[in-house]
């Protein structure tokens, strides 16, 4: 079996998983598939590794739990949530978070992923290179124009590691759904078909996605129909997810100190307090459920029973159950309710029947989160939408890495749908007169296969160098707002493709392809005008930074 792994590169935690055992019969049918979430080292109990990097005053770096334990040392800088910093271009924001021209988000990410991959290879005695690393990324990275470059940057970062042969990105909800599909078949002995709603609530993000699962021969195929979300992947900061909830609990508990919220968070002892509260939330899930089960919702904030005690400046401070409810109602409940409402509106508007509702991510294990989700969908006794899903709730936080591992081994396939409209357009440098879309949003993509511009009769459209059309890029369902290369970006694109004047009997064929990570490649062929199937020269250019290429032009055209 190849050295393939799935990586959940999370905002707050990261998990590596692999297929420990894979048995097939003589026809190739999978008869046994055993997944394993990999521990980062001997003696470590959890596969979940803190997505933290600490730069010490001597410029050396510490990672994960070591970084957490060393937080607050004089002259040190703690980097967290760095995955989402890939989309940040504001120098002031980057500087405020400790980034410099030397220690960029890209470098911190590379150092962190290099560390966890090497630990995995050492712990599990992996000889040779990693054949394929499939990484779960937020679904919004496939949808929101300002985060599109995050995919190419992350893929390039991991691909640059000399021991990684191939990198593929997949949306986190699709990966979680892949794990559910595999788990369903394992427990029920038949394949699942239908609509699955994935609610992924982690430490930094909320991602809600409606997935469609279909049979494809012996295997299953997953596609994402609709999504919405909140948190670091939406607003650009951790404000609507598990980390913010824990921070709010600590601030409430330490309010008797007289310190402000910012003073508490910036105190070097804060992260140890937060870590102890987080551990208590995981260890006392049954106590939380038993306490809140018998109290009306509107009375929960007034519960003074102690949940846990934290130590700050050598003094104990009580965390009450009422504080848990108050923090939840302030930080989590409003936005979770809003986003669940948005998804329900979509489901009802399109008359969609949801067959399964699955909660993944560590924060979905919290009782109040579970209760709010169930209330939103009016869960009743014996509700089949919530049953036969992921029976062991401890596996929820590993679902994305498990699904990525299954996709890495091609046990579950992912139906690739174009997240945007792509094509060519006619016009001048200052005006796009008409757009010709050759790939439409929602089209099923044959990955890495170029689609060329066609005439209405189905024949190939041929171009001469002086009449090369603009490249059109569009995220709008209505196609009313096109974004096209023009001026300097157009010149750069023509230069990259090496478009030049041709002989009188030659013409260009132009096309576009998308890879499995939905990264765009432009293609050219030089053909004989009298025999378009006769190709004299081919070339292509991968648009690694499409947002940077389009840049201000997008904003200008949409104003």
Predicted features along the sequence, with ranges:
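Conserved phosphate-binding/catalytic loops in two-lobed NTP-binding clefts
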Residues: 161-175, 373-403
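Gly/Thr-rich phosphate-binding beta-strand-loop-beta motif of the actin/hexokinase/Hsp70
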Residues: 2-26, 184-224, 508-525
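Acidic, glycine/GT-rich loop-and beta-edge segments that sit at the periphery of enzyme/chaperone cores
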Residues: 11, 261-262, 383-499
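Phosphate-binding loop and its immediate beta->loop->alpha context
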Residues: 26-156, 161, 241-298, 549-559
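Adenine-nucleotide phosphate-binding core of ATP-dependent small-molecule kinases
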Residues: 95-121, 311-347, 452-453, 462-465, ...
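Conserved phosphate-binding catalytic cores of ATP/NTP-utilizing and phosphoryl-transfer enzymes
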Residues: 1, 167-199, 398-413
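Glycine-rich phosphate-binding loops at beta-strand->alpha-helix junctions
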Residues: 133-150, 331, 351-376, 392-397
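Gly/charged contiguous loops adjacent to phosphate- or pyrophosphate-bearing nucleotide/cofactor binding elements
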Residues: 68-69, 73-76, 86, 234-372
């Amino acid at each position: 079996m190849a050295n393939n792994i799935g990586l959940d590169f999370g905002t707050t935690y990261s998990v590596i998983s692999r297929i420990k055992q894979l048995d097939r019969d003589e026809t190739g049918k999978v008869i046994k598939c055993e997944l394993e979430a990999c521990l980062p080292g001997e003696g470590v109990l959890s596969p979940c590794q803190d997505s933290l990097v600490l730069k010490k005053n001597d410029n050396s770096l510490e990672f994960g739990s070591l970084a957490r334990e060393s937080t607050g040392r004089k002259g040190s800088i703690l980097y967290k949530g760095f995955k989402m910093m890939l989309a940040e271009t504001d120098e002031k924001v980057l500087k405020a978070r400790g980034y410099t021209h030397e220690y960029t988000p890209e470098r911190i990410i590379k150092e962190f992923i290099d560390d966890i991959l090497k630990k995995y290879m050492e712990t599990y005695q992996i000889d040779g290179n990693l054949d394929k690393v499939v990484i779960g990324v937020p679904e919004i990275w496939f949808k929101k124009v300002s985060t599109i470059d995050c995919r190419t940057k992350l893929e390039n970062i991991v691909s640059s590691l000399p021991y990684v042969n191939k990198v593929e990105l997949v949306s986190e909800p699709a990966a979680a759904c892949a794990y559910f599909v595999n788990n369903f078949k394992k427990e029920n002995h038949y394949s699942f078909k239908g609509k699955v709603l994935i609610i992924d609530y982690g430490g930094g993000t909320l991602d809600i996605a409606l997935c469609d699962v279909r049979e494809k021969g012996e295997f299953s195929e997953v596609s994402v129909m609709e999504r919405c979300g909140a948190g670091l992947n939406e607003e650009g900061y951790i404000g609507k997810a598990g980390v913010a909830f824990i921070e709010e609990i600590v601030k409430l508990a330490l309010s008797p100190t007289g310190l402000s919220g910012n003073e508490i968070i910036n105190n070097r002892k804060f992260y140890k307090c937060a870590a102890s509260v987080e551990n208590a939330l995981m260890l006392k899930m049954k106590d939380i459920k038993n306490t809140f089960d018998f109290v009306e919702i509107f009375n929960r904030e007034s519960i003074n029973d102690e949940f846990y005690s934290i130590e700050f400046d050598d003094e104990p401070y009580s965390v009450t159950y009422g504080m848990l409810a108050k923090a939840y109602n302030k930080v989590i409940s409003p936005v979770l309710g809003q986003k669940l409402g948005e998804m329900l509106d979509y489901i009802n508007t399109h008359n969609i029947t949801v067959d399964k509702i699955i909660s993944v991510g560590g924060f979905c294990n919290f009782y109040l989160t579970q209760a709010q989700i169930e209330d939103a969908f009016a869960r009743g006794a014996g509700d089949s939408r919530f049953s036969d899903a992921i029976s062991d709730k401890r596996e929820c936080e590993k679902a994305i890495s498990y699904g990525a591992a299954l996709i890495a081994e091609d046990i579950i396939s992912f139906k690739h749908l174009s997240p945007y409209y792509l094509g060519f357009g006619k016009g001048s440098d200052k005006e796009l007169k008409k757009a010709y879309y050759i790939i439409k949003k929602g089209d099923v993509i044959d990955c890495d296969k170029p689609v060329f511009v066609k005439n209405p009769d189905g024949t190939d459209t041929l171009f001469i160098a002086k009449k090369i059309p603009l490249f059109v890029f569009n995220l709008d369902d209505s196609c009313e707002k096109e974004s096209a290369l023009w001026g300097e970006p157009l010149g750069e694109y023509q230069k990259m493709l090496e478009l030049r004047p041709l002989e009188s009997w030659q013409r260009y064929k132009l096309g576009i392809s998308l890879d499995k990570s939905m990264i765009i490649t432009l293609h050219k062929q030089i053909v004989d005008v009298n025999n378009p199937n006769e190709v004299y020269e081919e070339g292509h250019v991968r648009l690694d930074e499409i947002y940077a290429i389009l840049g201000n032009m997008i904003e200008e055209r949409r104003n």
